[in-house]
């Protein structure tokens, strides 16, 4: 194996590692935004638990971020605007990235 092949393999491994870290950070942020959004709702604790689980079940679907943020915007309409939800998600994502290194 040549030096070029070694470098190529190292770049591929780093890219895969970075992608996995970003995926994990996004999942952490989605879980946090679901909990945050539901905590703002004026519903019973049991209903909050159910809503949080329902939102978190969307995590693995294609377009999960858009689905979860849209659902929260709909559920919180009148209380929290869509920009505030997106800003809060971005803060959770930044925090998750920092935690993962």
Named regions from a protein language model:
Residues 1-101:
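A charge-rich, low-complexity, intrinsically flexible signal that marks solvent-exposed coils, linkers
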């Amino acid at each position: 194996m040549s030096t070029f092949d070694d470098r190529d393999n190292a770049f591929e491994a780093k890219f895969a590692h970075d992608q996995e870290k970003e995926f994990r950070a996004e999942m952490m942020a989605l879980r946090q935004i679901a909990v945050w959004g539901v905590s703002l709702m004026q519903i019973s604790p049991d209903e909050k638990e159910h809503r949080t689980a329902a939102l978190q079940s969307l995590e693995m679907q294609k377009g999960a971020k858009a689905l979860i943020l849209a659902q929260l915007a709909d559920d919180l309409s009148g209380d929290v605007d869509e920009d505030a939800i997106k800003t809060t998600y971005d803060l959770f994502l930044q925090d998750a990235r920092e935690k993962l290194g």
